[in-house]
């Protein structure tokens, strides 16, 4: 049996983190379609006088955003970073220069893991906004959901986030090992 090394774990991790990020983006679309169906049912309830019209309208907007999220993440990225780029976790693989030690592979794996967590955070943020449209939702739910969405966008763009923080607090620091 082969001995599993840390480098092997990072190699396998890079493919996994990319696949999970792509899966969550597809999951956004599926859940968005389901939530749109629920919003349509709530329009019927509003027409019958069982609930107000504001709830299904907000739910329709949230569902539409979730269906369009594969195009929405790059728009948020462009807004935050002044740089329009297609959301593609696999693009990180070519940005970081590789060497024989495998250290850069480890950085790539960690950055892809952070991107995956960011994608999940955005997904969770939208579900929290959806939950806030229901009666009895917690008072801090909207703030928490926006924190998840903004933090998720920063995590999806982790290289640019690191670059911005480094330029702000440590001007002149060399970030070439991150592909920046």
Model-derived segments and spans:
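Hydrophobic alpha-helical segments involved in membrane association or supramolecular assembly
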Residues: 3-83, 100-180
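Extended repeat-based interaction scaffolds and adjacent low-complexity, acidic/S/T/P-biased segments
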Residues: 86-87
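Short membrane-interface loop/juxtamembrane segments of multi-pass integral membrane proteins
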Residues: 90-103
């Amino acid at each position: 049996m082969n001995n599993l090394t840390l480098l092997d774990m990072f190699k396998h991790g890079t493919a996994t983190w990319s696949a999970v990020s792509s899966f969550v983006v597809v999951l956004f679309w599926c859940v968005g379609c389901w939530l749109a169906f629920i919003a349509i049912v709530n329009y019927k309830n509003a027409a019958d006088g069982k609930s107000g019209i504001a709830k299904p309208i907000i739910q329709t907007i949230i569902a539409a955003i979730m269906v369009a999220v594969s195009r929405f993440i790059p728009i948020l990225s462009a807004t935050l970073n002044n740089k329009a780029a297609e959301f593609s976790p696999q693009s990180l693989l070519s940005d970081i220069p590789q060497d024989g030690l495998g250290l850069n592979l480890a950085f790539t794996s960690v950055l892809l893991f952070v991107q995956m967590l960011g994608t999940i955070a955005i997904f969770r943020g939208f579900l929290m906004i959806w939950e806030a449209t229901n009666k009895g939702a917690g008072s801090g739910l909207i703030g928490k959901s926006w924190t998840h969405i903004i933090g998720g966008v920063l995590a999806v763009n982790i290289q640019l986030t690191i670059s911005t923080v480094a330029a702000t607090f440590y001007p002149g620091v060399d970030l070439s090992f991150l592909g920046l």
